[in-house]
Amino acid sequence: LEKLIGKHSPDIIGLQETKVDNENFPLEAIENLGYEVIINGQKGHYGVCLMSKNKPVNHGIGMPTDPEDAQCRLVWLEYKTKKGSLFVFNGYFPQGESRDHPIKFPYKEKFYKDLINYLKQDFDPESHLIVMGDLNISPEDIDIGIGENNRKRWLQTGKCSFLPEEREWLENLKDFGLYDSYRCLYPEENNTFSWFDYRSRGFDDNPKRGLRIDHLWVTKSLKDLIDSSSIDYEIRGMEKPSDHAPVWTKFNI
């Protein structure tokens, strides 16, 4: 995290799968890096955090439909900018495992549906709004870099990440008025990914083998303000990294 901040100095950072409850979150260490922090965490599982240089004016934890024992997977903040309010959702979307899983796959579908309904009911697609994080879906075939045989096998066995049903859930985000910020700049790039399996050492291969499942989706007003976007392989290449590479988008806002 220190390396990422030193290199990019982001105004806003979203973390997913923090795996720590709120009481044990290293709040002081993060604040010493120069960031305000809003967390939604639980011990050993899930967990999300939004960090920002400027203090947010509003925030939300989870979704209105969440039960008391909901998995901690979503946090959103509202910031004031020179061009009005900016809403940022950071999510650790369920992975789903496979189509035939009786619990995880329906839970993933419900999470997406609940988020779409939440956006439609309480937020404006005309506003500056971002949905970002580990969405756990590759939107297009050019976002799949695990080899054609593996791609076919995953589809045949119903393994999650790019099933037709999952892509339909992403289409609902598009229908709300969101755009994949990376694809806005690179509509045909087919060899850049954000997740690389530890066990098969896909990051070390040439070409690298992975999936693009981490995204920043933005409303049209922000789409028109995109300056640049990329995935940071240098950070992913550090010693003992996450299996995900940082993804980022810069806006002229």
Locations of the language-model features?
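Active-site beta-strand termini and strand-to-loop segments that position acidic
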Residues: 52-54, 77-83, 219-220, 242, ...
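Surface-exposed cleft-lining segments at the edges of enzyme active sites
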Residues: 64-65, 93-112, 153-158
